[in-house]
Amino acid sequence: MMSLAEQIEQQQDDAGWSAHLQLRFVQRDGVTRLGAWKHFGPLLVQRPFYPEGAPCHVYVLHPPGGIVAGDRLELDIHLEPGSHALLTMPGASKFYRSIGPTARLTQRFHMATGSTLEWLPQDSIFFSGARASLASRFTLEPGARLLAWETLCLGRPVMHERFDHGALDSLLHIELPDEVGLHERLRLAGGHLGKLGGHPLLATFCAAPADQAVLEQVRPLLDELGNPAGATLLGSLLVIRVLDHDNQHLQRTLQRLWHVLRPAILGLPACPPRIWAT
């Protein structure tokens, strides 16, 4: 039985709205197609693009008005064997101030044998006073390949607005076959950014399968940044973390890393999404 406090929080959560987007990618005649999709609420997807032939480029659209108290968004992505999807967003995910209930975004990615996912979203912006829960889970079957980044922006640095109160619970889980993978949780509350060294921006870039040679390729780029950054290998999973005070600088850093990692991991030249040029 739920406690009184839990019942009150549940009632508050019910005051928000729900959205669910489910996408399934399949390979047909050597080309990846959006085989099926379902949506409920304002989570949408634009028509696929094919700027490089076989891989399918898709833009995921979050609610234009942002994510507010009690909202619950779920994104489910499934890649069938041999498929290759590149997903990005035309804009940031904005979590606004909440006086009570938590806004929740849950993202699940399942990658079948031999499939390839590039998950390259814009940043998630948490306004001062936001109460947010963000969970991203990736499951890779044998032979699957992954390039994925996630950017957390606490406050609005460009407007000199600090994340001086509020709470964030962020989970990043990557499951690899026969390996430990990654299970990382970050909790921030009350505007205390000591875990980030006072930096309002944190980016995590994950790539698999990687090896020592790939690690050595990215380290010189990180050394040039002039701000805290590091890279490590967890089995065949490369994990890169970067702290910053400037969102545009951080986005450029992630794109530079992607230009290096895409040929190294996927054996393909970089083909940036058109939205990056706007």
Swiss-Prot record:
InterPro entries: UreD. Pfam families: UreD (PF01774). It is found in: Cytoplasm. Keywords: Chaperone, Cytoplasm, Nickel insertion. Coiled coil: none annotated. It comes from the Bacteria. One of its GO terms (cellular component) is cytoplasm. GO terms for molecular function: nickel cation binding. Its main location: cytoplasm. Belongs to the UreD family. Required for maturation of urease via the functional incorporation of the urease nickel metallocenter. UreD, UreF and UreG form a complex that acts as a GTP-hydrolysis-dependent molecular chaperone, activating the urease apoprotein by helping to assemble the nickel containing metallocenter of UreC. The UreE protein probably delivers the nickel. This is Urease accessory protein UreD. The gene is ureD.
